[in-house]
Swiss-Prot record:
Keywords: Calcium channel impairing toxin, Disulfide bond, Ion channel impairing toxin, Knottin, Neurotoxin, Presynaptic neurotoxin, Secreted, Signal, Toxin, Voltage-gated calcium channel impairing toxin. Disulfide bonds join C51-C66, C58-C69, C65-C74. InterPro entries: Conotoxin. This is Omega-conotoxin-like TxMKLT1-0142. It is found in: Secreted. It comes from Conus textile. Residues 23-49 form a propeptide. Its main location: secreted.
Length: 75
């Protein structure tokens, strides 16, 4: 029991030490959201794409149907 507790404490200590001494050249999470916001391209969002209705011609390799692409037609 004592050995188990000592092992748990040692693992927790080493984990904390690893995170505390890790080299972080990007200033941590400080600018993470600002950077992600500026790199985001809203025009490339999949939510802006219109899906094809049933009966319209679709591409087999890159289907954009609302349902399934079967034999080059949306189902």
């Amino acid at each position: 029991m004592k050995l188990t507790c000592m092992m748990i404490v040692a693992v927790l200590f080493l984990t904390a030490w690893t995170f505390a001494t890790a080299d972080d050249s990007s200033n941590g999470l400080e600018n993470l959201f600002l950077k992600a916001h500026h790199e985001m391209n809203p025009e490339a969002s999949k939510l802006n794409e219109r899906c094809l209705d049933a009966g319209e011609i679709c591409d087999f390799f890159f289907p954009t149907c609302c349902g399934y692409c079967i034999l080059l037609f949306c189902a």
